[in-house]
Amino acid sequence: MKRTWIRNALVLGWIPTLGLLLAFAQGPTPVKITRLYTGADGKTKVEEYEIPLKPQGKGTELGQTVAVKSVQFRRTNKDYDLDWHPAPSRQFVVTLSGESEIELEGGRKIRLGPGNILLAEDTTGQGHISRAIGSGDRISLFIPLADGAPSPR
């Protein structure tokens, strides 16, 4: 009985249709940001949020523009391990390939892989530890925010 139902569902196209309905029910892929910032205690904190997007035409959604200074490509190898440090500037760090890990006081670890967007705003205080994960290089983009630019939300 069960096999007949599955066979009929495949023949009639119900399963692909169900998958399509589930995809639409979940909505579009959100743009997620992992933000590091300095708390009142001088220690780095983390929060995650989504950038709101608005429809801009057929198949396109855009967020607000963000004023930035420049774009810098970076490669780090598997030996990269930087002890406690604050971010050198308020900047996006976008991982293109490879993986890294950010460690906060208390041992909390945040893993960053391809497609992850980090907004490093912990420019004062103790900062965080950064290290490579895995056996390959990590390629990333550093995108410093313009002076006085608000944090994108």
Where are the language model's segments positioned?
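Short beta-strand His + acidic residue motifs that chelate non-heme Fe in jelly-roll/DSBH
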Residues: D83-W84, I102-E103, A120-E121, Q126-G134
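Bacterial N-terminal signal peptides
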Residues: A9-A23
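Short acidic-glycine-tyrosine-enriched beta hairpin
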Residues: G106-D122
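Short, conserved beta-strand element in jelly-roll/cupin
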Residues: N77, H85-I102
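A short glycine-rich, His/Asp/Glu-containing loop-to-beta-strand
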Residues: A40-W84, R138, A146
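N-terminal secretory signal peptides that target proteins for export/translocation
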Residues: M1-I6
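Short beta-strand segments in beta-sandwich/barrel cores
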Residues: D81-L82, E99-E103, I117, G148
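A short hydrophobic beta-strand segment most commonly corresponding to one strand
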Residues: L119-T123, I133-P150
